[in-house]
Amino acid sequence: AELKSCFPVGHECDDDASNCNCCGDDVYCACGWGRWNCKCKVADQSYAYGICKDKVNCPNRHLWPAKECKMPCRRNCG
């Protein structure tokens, strides 16, 4: 199914439709135990890069202000 929209953080999301459900490069579909109660959630810094790389090919990526995926900063940052 072509995604023509995306959900904001905190909105319920469909686990089966991947993180493309959720608006934002670092926002993913997080589910409770047993894959229920799934909601769009902002990824921790350590996961954000992987989520972003995953979402580069989302067909609806133009719907959110897409950023460059930045490697997580390990040490001596800024």
UniProtKB/Swiss-Prot annotation:
Keywords: Disulfide bond, Knottin, Neurotoxin, Secreted, Toxin. InterPro entries: Toxin_34. The keyword Disulfide bond applies. Signal peptide: none annotated. GO terms for cellular component: extracellular region. Expressed by the venom gland. Disulfide bonds join C6-C23, C13-C29, C20-C52, C22-C40, C31-C38, C58-C73, C69-C77. It comes from the Eukaryota. Pfam families: Toxin_34. Transmembrane segments: none annotated. It is found in: Secreted. GO terms for molecular function: toxin activity. The presence of a 'disulfide through disulfide knot' structurally defines this protein as a knottin. Lethal neurotoxin. Causes spastic paralysis and death in mice in 4-6 minutes after intracerebroventricular injection at dose levels of 1.5 ug per mouse. Belongs to the neurotoxin 04 (omega-agtx) family. 02 (Tx1) subfamily. This is U5-ctenitoxin-Pk1a.
